[in-house]
């Protein structure tokens, strides 16, 4: 069993204890860690919606360290990221594979980052089904439909052609952060927090 650290905070009403992840949510930081499945996705979606209700104009930062997981669970997080008003900055720590890489790429353009020793992997969806031939055909067609949809999402967020995406997704494609940047999955490789701060200043200067 993993022990989650508790943070004790002094307030005007006395001491208040938070688990470390809840305390970070107060700072608008969300963690997507471990396999992506329905229960975890529901928590992430709830956090995104809560932070939007708290302040619809302030960025949310999503840290990702995930091997991927269930496509429908991942897409529920993806759709919520696109649905809410705040920009969602994504940062890969460790790895972002499969659905994890899709969520990494789905961050707000210009605010998608990776730490230098992380690993990113993309591939086509997989699945299996046992049963009657007709049912197997139905599920095979569904996997192909999902594959097409995922390719279209990568196309939208990376700027690559659908044909190029299909080629890259044909087999497991492992990348270091710089390779991921070159194909548009992320915008920048960062080593220190100040790298993001400098980037934000540059963006503000361009807007101004």
From Swiss-Prot:
Name of the protein this chain belongs to: ATP-dependent Clp protease proteolytic subunit
Active site: 98, 123
InterPro entries hit by this protein: ClpP, ClpP/crotonase-like_dom_sf, ClpP/TepA, ClpP_His_AS, ClpP_Ser_AS
Assembly mode: Fourteen ClpP subunits assemble into 2 heptameric rings which stack back to back to give a disk-like structure with a central cavity, resembling the structure of eukaryotic proteasomes.
Role of this protein: Cleaves peptides in various proteins in a process that requires ATP hydrolysis. Has a chymotrypsin-like activity. Plays a major role in the degradation of misfolded proteins.
Recorded family membership: Belongs to the peptidase S14 family.
SUPFAM superfamilies the record matches: ClpP/crotonase
Enzyme Commission code(s) on record: 3.4.21.92
Broadest EC class assigned to this enzyme: hydrolase
Intracellular or extracellular location(s): Cytoplasm
Main location, first listed in the record: cytoplasm
Keywords assigned by UniProt, alphabetized: Cytoplasm, Hydrolase, Protease, Serine protease
Source species: Wolbachia sp. subsp. Drosophila simulans (strain wRi)
GO cellular component, one term: cytoplasm
Reactions catalysed, as given in the entry: Hydrolysis of proteins to small peptides in the presence of ATP and magnesium. alpha-casein is the usual test substrate. In the absence of ATP, only oligopeptides shorter than five residues are hydrolyzed (such as succinyl-Leu-Tyr-|-NHMec, and Leu-Tyr-Leu-|-Tyr-Trp, in which cleavage of the -Tyr-|-Leu- and -Tyr-|-Trp bonds also occurs)
